[in-house]
Amino acid sequence: MEIILIKPVRKLGKIGDILKVADGFGRNYLLPQKLAIRATEPNKELIVKQKHEFEAKDKQIREEVEKINALIKEQKLVFIRQTSDDGKLFGSITNKEIADKLSENVSYNIFHSNIILDKKIKSTGIYTVEIRLHAELNAIVTVIVARSESEVQDYLREQKNESLETLAESA
């Protein structure tokens, strides 16, 4: 299937690119998500005319996302949860919970589908989580899972000491 991208798609292309993709990928993902349109002759002509408009809109979105990124990258999300004696959570922390807490902290809607989490967080500790804000921009946040506030402070002190040791070794 031949398609024209109307939004940038990670690892695929940018606005206005004409690509051949698998039929299922085009029909089941790109077209319904309004990331692309079919590459017919009228659509090709239309895209040439509207390419600047799409690029301007994407630039505006990217600027907005960069503002959000500036707010997000300094965030440390703290989850206080009950655990067993060996530090395993009763339950887990999912990408939805991370998105909700992050949205609450930065006053922007972050969707759980934007949180890149290989597997659910099931034990205490410090985790780095990637957030996909735009096709070309990801942010990293720190997630701290602990039993109590004092344990959170211990984790933060440990992390600070490790970063100081790393600086001392590199100097």
Swiss-Prot record:
Keyword Ribonucleoprotein belongs to the record: yes
Cellular component aspect of the GO annotation: ribonucleoprotein complex; ribosome
InterPro entries: Ribosomal_bL9, Ribosomal_bL9/RNase_H1_N, Ribosomal_bL9_bac/chp, Ribosomal_bL9_C, Ribosomal_bL9_C_sf, Ribosomal_bL9_N, Ribosomal_bL9_N_sf
Molecular function, one GO term: rRNA binding
GO BP terms, alphabetized: translation
Domain of life, per lineage: Bacteria
Keyword RNA-binding: yes
Keywords, ordered alphabetically: Ribonucleoprotein, Ribosomal protein, RNA-binding, rRNA-binding
Homology family: Belongs to the bacterial ribosomal protein bL9 family.
Role this protein plays: Binds to the 23S rRNA.
Name of the molecule in the record: Large ribosomal subunit protein bL9
Organism expressing this protein natively: Rickettsia canadensis (strain McKiel)
